[in-house]
Amino acid sequence: MSKRTFAVILTLLCSFCIGQALAGGIVLQRTRVIYDASRKEAALPVANKGAETPYLLQSWVDNIDGKSRAPFIITPPLFRLEAGDDSSLRIIKTADNLPENKESLFYINVRAIPAKKKSDDVNANELTLVFKTRIKMFYRPAHLKGRVNDAWKSLEFKRSDHSLNIYNPTEYYVVFAGLAVDKTDLTSKIEYIAPGEHKQLPLPASGGKNVKWAAINDYGGSSGTETRPLQ
């Protein structure tokens, strides 16, 4: 993969870094939330950029599988956001049984329901579009080893047969902004790697000599790129 192609991929991935937009004008001002364990809560600013339509916002936190609620509450869990207004969602931890030696990943869900106009005929058949988005929330304990900004550089890559083995020896999640082995783009094959995790991706028969990757930082931007010979 050429440097130009890799740069284009990073640009496209990071074009959403400023904020996560739902259709209809609702904008989450962050693409991820870092919950610092040393603080009592975290915040997620939200705005209604629309000119006319108020929205009813419903928010909650769930686990990675999306099937069970996480040990966090969001307040207010349900509220009306007028056109042109902004607000902030407060995320509060409700349990003390989370790992303290590594990051944990959860997801914040925000559902936006447009308010009906008073003039709308309640008996008329109509389609109401409900918009929903889901962003990552990292629970970060205090006193983790190493620097979070350096975690992505600590990843280990090894080739075995027709596979790329990826190891994360750090206590932080690393979210990929790009991954390629020579000219083979693997970005769509992996989203993130958890602390202490090992992942394996298939490689073409030709293998590859060099691995190039980039990560997404706490602010939703790119970390830059790193290139390393494959062992």
Curated annotation (Swiss-Prot):
One GO BP on record is: chaperone-mediated protein folding
One further remark on this entry is:
The operon is cryptic under classical laboratory conditions, but is functional when constitutively expressed.
Q: Where in the cell is it found?
A: Periplasm
Family according to the record: Belongs to the periplasmic pilus chaperone family.
Q: Which gene encodes it?
A: yraI
Q: Which organism is it from?
A: Escherichia coli (strain K12)
Q: Hey, what's the signal peptide range on this chain?
A: 1-23
**What's the protein here called?**
Probable fimbrial chaperone YraI
- Chain's role: Part of the yraHIJK fimbrial operon. Could contribute to adhesion to various surfaces in specific environmental niches. Increases adhesion to eukaryotic T24 bladder epithelial cells in the absence of fim operon.
What Pfam family does this protein match (any one)? PapD_C
Q: Listed GO molecular functions?
A: protein folding chaperone
Domain of life of the source: Bacteria
PANTHER family documented for this protein: CHAPERONE PROTEIN FIMC-RELATED, PILUS ASSEMBLY CHAPERONE
A single GO cellular-component term on record: outer membrane-bounded periplasmic space
